[in-house]
Amino acid sequence: MVELSLQDLRYTYNVLKEEALEACGKGDYLLVDSLLANISALVCQYNWRYADSELDDVIAAVSTHICPLDKCPAKLNPKRIVFFDKFGTTYVLAVQYLAALAKAGYEVLYVLCDHNQGITAQLTPIIEHLRPYRNITIVQMDNTKARFEKVRDIYRHICEYAPAKIFVHTSSYTTFNYVLPAIGGGITKYYIDLGDHNFWFGAGHVDYVLPYRQFGATIDYEKRGFKREQILLMPYYPCVVKREFVGFPVSTEGKVVLFTGGDYYKTIDKDNTYWTLLRELVVRYPNLLIFYAAKNISPKEQERLKTFLAERDYAERLVNIGFRADINEVFQHIDIFMGTCPMSGGLMTQYAAINHKPILQFYPDWLNTNNETEQVLDYNAQPSISTSDRSSFFTEAGKLINDEEYRKKRGDELYKAIIKPEEFDELLVRTITSNETQVPLRFYSIQYNALVEWWLMIDHSGMLDGLGYCYGLLKKYHSLNRVILKYQIRRAIRKIRRIVG
């Protein structure tokens, strides 16, 4: 079949990497910037590697060209911290860290850069969360400026502020990547490993990494080159934005309500496991009503979901409620949460726990080491939730659906297990004061090959077009190669099919 392969991805990556190394040697830093952005986008989509020390060296070389290394002060303020943030939203971890640092008495310079918008609807919730803290100063970089100009502006802010510590809360490739190598003089740098399953630049430019689960800690150790003593495990709690509950599209009276959903791609596998489980739950339990909240669904996938829901009576008892801004309030009005599979979502799992809701979770055997369910809840206890055995899954489902007291007991157990805000605050201060992990590390065997195969499976399902993306990246560098040939063959086949039928 004419499909994207791991070999195609590696070939494309290596071509772009060689171009970046050559451009850096020639001093063409704008081309380097463009190439690194493309490399980051490619690898983060398929996640077959997690770091690249040679490209980190390229970033350091460009940083030396951009930043005046003699400007930063030798004297630092031990109570000052700079916090880099690319997102500007409450959905990730900025609020948790910033609030803890502010409550501990640190002065914090909160630097927003590369975020999508200014102080608009997206940023309003995080600004409101931070408003009570007078010791947090917010600086928004001008995103209309060129990247390297923003690098100099951020570097100047750091030099003027003279912090003792810097926290980086960002994605794979941003303006901050060029700032980090230039920072020396005893400033301690921490990277919050938010996208632990993704490739990211800069592992060699920070002193410590802060993963939120054992999965991320294992990858940091095995794939990113961090020493054990550099890994400071920091579990987190979800930031709740209170909103008015807007209700459900159908009545829930007399029903047990199961809520499920998240990013659509997390439900894709060769066996249609997730959707098959939902279908069987509907068939087995007539009193069960399932609400599905979907995010990031393409028109093609929307049509596929619509077709699935139209089968038999599924449409009446398996209802798509779309994206919900009032997600916390949704959890308050349901009985059971079921995580997606083969990949689950940590934030949805935590929303269930803080609202005392029990969780159903299934992982297929071939991809169960990415388990995000127990790992985002196991601070005060070690809950047992997920299974790879269908019989055990439906046994637990039956108990949760038919026994209200059992539901409450299981939900209360999860609430007790998850880290609470005050525990997070205290843990963070102890961690960055000692620079030693306060939570024991438990490295374990990860199914790396299965993870790559799953990302390729998503591509082959039609949700992504990695072959077309690689073709677009390569055609300007090489007139003929295996990726371009495969793309052209696929295009010809599609054209013939349109003509024939």
Language model features with spans:
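N-terminal subdomain of nucleotide-sugar transferases
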Residues: 2-134
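Active-site-proximal region of nucleotide-activated glycan assembly enzymes
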Residues: 184-241
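C-terminal amphipathic helix plus adjacent low-complexity
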Residues: 2-27, 395-397, 402-501
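Conserved active-site histidine-acidic residue motif and adjacent donor-binding/catalytic loop
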Residues: 144-148, 318-330, 344
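A short, active-site helix/loop in glycosyltransferases that binds the activated sugar's phosphate group
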Residues: 32, 36-49, 206-230, 304-307
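Short N-terminal targeting/anchoring amphipathic segment
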Residues: 7-8, 81-84, 155-173, 337-341
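Catalytic binding pocket for nucleotide-activated donors in carbohydrate/polymer assembly enzymes
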Residues: 336, 340-419
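Conserved catalytic-core segment of nucleotide-activated headgroup transferases in glycan assembly
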Residues: 93-94, 100, 217-312, 316-320
